[in-house]
Amino acid sequence: MKENLILKESEVIRILYPPGIVQTDDCYLDEEGRIYTTDTICEGTHFRIEWSGPKEIAQKLVEVNVSDIAAGGGIPTKAFLNLGLSTQCSKEEWILPFSISLQESLSSYNIELCGGDTYRSSSLNLTLTLIGVTTKPWKRSGGKDGDFLYLTGSVGLSLLGYKILKEGLDIPEPLRSLALERHLTPKARLKVSKELSKNSPVSCCMDLTDGLLLDLPKLASSSNLGLKIDLEKIPILSNILTYLSLGEVLSSGEELELIFLSPVELPKTLCETSLTKIGNTTSDWKGVKFFQGNSEKTFEHLGFEHF
């Protein structure tokens, strides 16, 4: 394939919508307060069957979709599943353990499986659609000048887990287990989202799926604001920078952490999850600028692309 024929995910999305229509949120909100999302995970793009078993794949499928609902300020209630099954998926060794894990993951969020479709595929393709409810929806376009930028948890673990599996990096415990867990079975921050929705003003929110270097510009663009990021405030677990460069950490995708704007100072922990203020919005420029002290920094790594 010629290089100029390879489109970025954002370009594909723009082409699909009619001229003048811009969809920047991961969820759709209807007039009755229902919130919808759908996400697909594909063999070779989002997981490898030599690394992930049916249990882990089912968990990841649920979590990435729940994460979208959490980023929209909603609570998931119903699910529809489309399964593209390859010839390697036998009933006993794959479909049954996948089904058990899927039901356990959905039940943990009180989500009802309502229907779907199955088909034969050359490789595994799994799509989950979630419907939820919300009384305080969060749109990416809701950011205001002077808002504080917050990040839940920490970043870098997912990419480190990928490198452990792909390159055989020798990482000591407990960092090794934390990295593998984040890469193979990341967890949505739904509890944090619920608590914020109840008690704290949130201007806008998104989940971290493509890395900070790609996702932060999306947030800034949607609210037509600039973001000033303090690199020294970004939460990175001890010793990760021994194995990854800072640019790689900022490119780590599928972390499923929440990035959100709020006009108020928030506590440093919520639902046993850290909340870190890593920057603020500004009307002085558009886009994202990273600072280390008073010096602006730029990075070559751009984050996780789906194409």
From Swiss-Prot:
Positions with a binding annotation for Mg(2+) 1: 38-39, 117
InterPro entries linked to this entry? PurM-like_C_dom, PurM-like_C_sf, PurM-like_N, PurM-like_N_sf, ThiL-like
Q: What class of enzyme is it?
A: transferase
Entry keywords, A to Z: ATP-binding, Kinase, Magnesium, Metal-binding, Nucleotide-binding, Thiamine biosynthesis, Transferase
Which pathway does it take part in?
Cofactor biosynthesis; thiamine diphosphate biosynthesis; thiamine diphosphate from thiamine phosphate: step 1/1
Q: According to the UniProt entry, what is the EC number of this protein?
A: 2.7.4.16
What SUPFAM superfamilies does the record tag this protein with? PurM C-terminal domain-like (SSF56042), PurM N-terminal domain-like (SSF55326)
Question: Which amino acid positions bind ATP, per UniProt?
Answer: 116-117, 140, 209
Gene Ontology biological process terms from the UniProt entry: thiamine biosynthetic process; thiamine diphosphate biosynthetic process
Reactions performed catalytically = thiamine phosphate + ATP = thiamine diphosphate + ADP
For the ligand (substrate), the binding residues are 46, 254, 304
Other remarks? Reaction mechanism of ThiL seems to utilize a direct, inline transfer of the gamma-phosphate of ATP to TMP rather than a phosphorylated enzyme intermediate.
Q: What does this protein do?
A: Catalyzes the ATP-dependent phosphorylation of thiamine-monophosphate (TMP) to form thiamine-pyrophosphate (TPP), the active form of vitamin B1.
NCBIfam families according to UniProt: thiL
The family classification in the record reads: Belongs to the thiamine-monophosphate kinase family.
* Name of the protein in question: Thiamine-monophosphate kinase
Tell me the organism.
Leptospira interrogans serogroup Icterohaemorrhagiae serovar Lai (strain 56601)
